[in-house]
Amino acid sequence: MDVQGFHHLAIQVREVEKVTAFYRDVLGFSELKRHHREDGSLRSIGVEVPGEGFLALEEVSGEPEPGPFRNERPGLFLLAFRIPKAGRAGVVEAFARAGVPLEHETRWTVYVRDPEGNRVALSHHPED
């Protein structure tokens, strides 16, 4: 087997435009491409993850189910992105300006939730 790296992660979301705005406008990820269904409705939006790969935000119906900060259910736990240690204060300020509450912090990582309740971490662990 010759796995060469991360390609993408698909996340099902109810409000694809709102979630895309979080990753694009708050985290600064570039929007790559929009995909439409045969009827012309928006199906998904891809946003580039800095360094390698992308997130495919796939629109679905149904209610999101955000859980507590830490739960013991199988499945996606969080999306963690690397930041430089010197950039941490700027990350916290950017979330405050965007009205995104911090859910939890450790000495290395800042945790928030995207608009649909998915846990997102920005981390300089183990000290970049």
Residue ranges of model-derived segments:
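A short beta-turn/loop motif at secondary-structure boundaries
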Residues: 36-40, 111-114
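Short, solvent-exposed loop/turn segments that connect beta-strands within catalytic domains
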Residues: 39-42, 50-51
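Short hydrophobic/aromatic beta-strand element in the GNAT-like acyltransferase core
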Residues: 44, 109-110, 119
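Short, small/polar residue-rich loop motifs at catalytic or cofactor-binding pockets
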Residues: 105-107
